[in-house]
Curated annotation (Swiss-Prot):
It is found in: Cytoplasm. It comes from Aeromonas salmonicida (strain A449). This is Ribosomal RNA large subunit methyltransferase E. It comes from the Bacteria. The lineage of its organism: Bacteria, Pseudomonadati, Pseudomonadota, Gammaproteobacteria, Aeromonadales. Keywords: Cytoplasm, Methyltransferase, rRNA processing, S-adenosyl-L-methionine, Transferase. One of its GO terms (molecular function) is rRNA (uridine-2'-O-)-methyltransferase activity.
């Protein structure tokens, strides 16, 4: 059988990935992924996570953000995580594997959260990329709309929301939607986010509902 050759774009991505200083640093420190440096930088600027908080982490696998969050909230806090992909266990993290887009999975996640409101909703969700920007953008926007809907269901008054968003069609409308629901909204582009990536993080605090 002839081995399928990698496309130039995938070969370039692999080289960029393994040459990435943050990938190397994450491996050296035994961290789940380079994504932990993004939430670490956001935490340094915005102080979203504190001891004793309850946090929901959407799109959690392989666990970088959950790993960071559980260290921040400590033994008296809670981290409830969800992803369609499997994730190796992390002490102190209640992980649910399932497709967040499905009602049954959402129901199971809400059961894990319980009756009390949460302090922070985090979303690093991203769709499987097709390579067609219009399709990928629509899929990404759908996921972040679901994340915002999660805030409406579980986030306490004055709670916080941090979400990965890809700049493109629908971005401005989504940003305006968040500004109506939160007292303060900032856009962050962490140093560890690849420069050519369209991703930014919306950091919203002071939930009004």
């Amino acid at each position: 059988m002839t081995q399928k050759k990698r496309s130039p774009s995938s070969t370039r991505w692999l080289k960029e990935h393994f040459d990435d200083q943050y990938v190397k640093k994450a491996q050296k420190l035994g961290l789940r992924s380079r994504a932990v440096f993004k939430i670490d930088e956001i935490q340094g600027k915005d102080k979203l996570l504190r001891t004793g908080m309850t946090v929901v982490d959407l799109g959690a696998a392989p666990g970088g953000w959950s790993q960071f969050a559980v260290e921040q909230v400590g033994d008296n806090g809670r981290v409830i995580a969800c992803d369609i992909l499997p994730m190796d266990p992390i002490a102190g993290v209640d992980f649910l594997q399932g497709d967040f887009r499905e009602e049954t999975v959402l129901g199971a996640l809400l059961d894990r959260v319980g009756p009390d409101k949460v302090d922070v909703v985090m979303s690093d969700m991203a769709p499987n990329m097709s390579g067609t920007q219009q399709v990928d953008q629509a899929r990404a926007m759908y996921l972040i709309e679901l994340a915002l809907d999660m805030c409406n269901q579980v986030l306490r008054t004055n709670g916080s929301f941090v979400v990965k968003v890809f700049q493109g069609e629908g971005f401005d409308a989504y940003l305006n939607e968040i500004r109506k629901l939160f007292s303060a909204v900032k856009i962050r582009k962490p140093d560890s986010s690849r420069a050519r990536s369209r991703e930014v993080y919306i950091v919203a605090t002071g939930f009004k509902l």
